[in-house]
Amino acid sequence: GVSKPFDEVIKHFGDPHAFGQPPVSSLRQLLSCLICPSFLEEPSYPKDIKEKARRILEATEHFSIGSYTDSLGLRIVREHVAQFITKRDGYAADPGSIFLTNGGTTGIRIALAALATGCLCSDKNKAGLMIPIPGFPHYVARIKQFNMYKIPYYLNEDNNWALDTCELERVLDESRPHCRPRGLVLINPGNPTGQVLSYDNIREVIKFCAREKLVLFADEVYQETVFTNEVQFHSCKKVLRDLGPEYNKFQLMSIHSASKGFYGECGLRGGYIEVVGFSKEVLAQFKRYLSPPHKAPSTAGQAAVSAICNPPQPGDESYETFIKEKMSIMDSYQRKAGITTKMLNSLKDVSCNAVTGSLYAFPKVILPQKAIEEAKLNNCTPDEFYCWQMLEATGINSIPGNLFGQKEGTYHFRLTILPSEEKVVPMFDRISKFHEEFIQQYRSDKDN
């Protein structure tokens, strides 16, 4: 093939272990005990891990994770999730309102299918769903799959990608002649935008949804990937409960996953969805939708969920190793996020909000007119052209902003903070060199 000026292609997608991030020992030890119960007698394994594994195995058929579970997931794991949510928010969670899923994307599919098919409402008109732009492309795909009506709303880039209630009201009013608006998707921390929403912003969104009778769907899979003391993750459930009894009937669906954060177990496909504010009749319909048993989530994935929701505690034999591994990963994330933000903002005609959560940066780039025209000649969008040229010159496979959505006339690309620390600075040296040469090549007098 044609030789390239690089010796490695760096793919910028959100798969921590694909970038060499080490697994968390306690999770893998739990999983190995469940897969091979003879490890319960292994003296080198921490006692607390073996005890957790034994309790999960006792909840399965014939002491084996090879059997189907209840379609909602093992009760013991749902109890672990409820305890995790209760500790996180300071408000009790009900295991009966928690359903285990094959990863976060399956939780999205189940929730949107329920909204679209009338499982959660009696309205027969086409369901409308408000989704953030920029946002996770999976929502657009599911909207098409379930024949829903897409209601895109723009995040405010000038205000650190916050949700703007004026924007929400505008797009909602415009959508009403075309659909029956049923829900709003909120992604926090943001993908691809890398921000963590403030408490007040979340409260505003909840009040907006309450006024408009919308189900709030909280995509919180990056909740444990906040790596700066300057911001704090606030769950929608916590903010909702703080609003008091007046909001007890507010309808909220929240998802979490073992795929992201310092665990990064994308391949295990473990997740959960919590449903609150719905009547017993609606919950019964939702549970029927998840039946029969052959729709049960992967037991290995359920074990991963148990591990992230029931981690080692102080005093446990495994705790010292666990906290050391966790802090090593999180400290590395923080350093790489800082380098990423600084390096991107040092590039001419590039601006990037601080990366404070999730795994991504989403910088805006002002492209020369000649580059925009060249993109048209190559039958691609300007941001696709920029990312394509970056790949050809550096081997860095960034993702163009149009895949996530962006305001017309603006151009972005997404990078991840997952490459190893040894590769981050050399990677940005290559990006900086490419960017300078690209701008120089396509700049004209009109751009000055």
Question: Which residue ranges define each predicted feature?
Answer:
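Eukaryotic N-terminal low-complexity, Ser/Thr- and Lys/Arg-rich leader segments
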Residues: 1-6, 167-177, 245-246, 317-321, ...
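N-terminal low-complexity, Ser/Thr- and acidic-residue-enriched intrinsically disordered segments
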Residues: 1-21
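Generic structural signal for small/hydrophobic residues in well-ordered secondary structure
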Residues: 11, 81, 98, 129, ...
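Short catalytic/ligand-binding loop motif for oxyanion handling, primarily in non-cytosolic enzymes
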Residues: 17-23, 139, 192-195, 212, ...
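Conserved PLP-binding catalytic core of the aspartate aminotransferase-like
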Residues: 18-19, 323-334, 338, 344-393, ...
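Conserved core of the PLP fold type I
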Residues: 25, 31-211, 217, 223-246, ...
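Conserved core segment of the aminotransferase class I/II
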Residues: 26, 30, 36, 48-56, ...
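Active-site-adjacent capping/gating segments
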Residues: 372, 382-426
